Structure formats: structure tokens, C-alpha cells
Amino acid sequence: DGALDHFADVPCPSGSGPRHMEFNEAVDRLYCICELSGEVLVYDVPTFSLLQRIQADEVNAGGSADVHLHPSGQYLYTSHRLDNDGISIFKTLADGTLEKIGYARTGRHPRNFMITPDGKLLLVACMNDNLVQVFRIEADGALTLTPSVLRFENDRPSCLTL
């Protein structure tokens, strides 16, 4: 009938500012990027008990924005804006917790990004630069900026989706 039923509450630390979440079905984990604290919260599913708090925003700018899991499930990426704009890179461990393995600088104000279904590219909407940057995802999860770029005249791209 299209109705939604309440399943559970996901407890988030006070002042963290939960923004977006991503499921990892392979290991029954939920990842939450927190805009204000700059953390990724890792939860067990279906209990929603908090397993890990790991810092993603390197400078505590209070502008963490988006989170996406690589199609392989091996890497998690988060975007950060307002200062030291970029993408944090995490390796997903066997138990679904995270290990931070890198950071890739982007254009200004990367509010949103997407990973192509084949897992080869990561596209970032750099709102304050009026462009979309294209990164190649390497075998080790690292990001390499490609020469490909989409430029816009005063359109301030803020969301990408397929």
C-alpha cells in the first residue's frame, strides 16, 4: 500500500549533525557522515548500536557533506567543504569498520559527489567553482584527478545522480 512503518531510531551523538547515510549490505553496517563534527559513525544493522566514530574532516570545518560506498564495498568516500575542501578515503575492514587511508583535494565547496556504477570514476560537484571534477578511482582506492571537467556558467552544481 506504499505506507512506511517505523523500524528503528538511529542514535547520533549530540551536536554531530547527521547528514547522509549509506548501507553496506555485505557486512550489515550503516555509515553516517556528520556535517558538524566531521565524523563518520559506523553502526551495526539491525541493532543500530554505534561501533565506531572516526574523524573524516581533517580541519574540523563543520562542513562535511556526502558519503558513498564504492560498488566493491572495499572503500568509503566522504566529502568536506568550507575549508580544506576534498574527499576523505576510507578502507572498509572485514568487520565493516573503517580505516582512513587518504584525502584528495577538490575544487571549492564539494557539496555532493557520485561514483559511477562500474566503480571506475568519482565525480564531484564543486559548487563554488561552477564545475564538476572527474577523478579516476585507483585499485587501492586512491583518487587521481583527470583532465576531464564540466564547467558551468553561474549554475553552481550541487547534486549529481544517475
Residue ranges and their predicted role:
Residues 1-3, 43-49, 89-97, 135-142:
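Short loop/turn segments immediately following beta-strands, especially the blade-tip
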Residues 5-12, 49-58, 99-105, 146-151:
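A short beta-strand motif characteristic of beta-propeller blades
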Residues 12-29, 57-73, 104-121, 150-162:
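Beta-rich, blade/repeat-based domains predominating
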Residues 24, 32-36, 78-82, 124-127:
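Conserved beta-strand positions in repeat-built beta-propeller and related beta-rich domains
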Residues 33-45, 50-79:
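Oxyanion-binding "anion nests"
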Residues 38-40, 84-87, 130-132:
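Structural signal for beta-propeller blades
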Residues 65, 69-109:
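C-terminal structural cap/anchor segments
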Residues 121-156:
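Internal helix-turn-beta structural module
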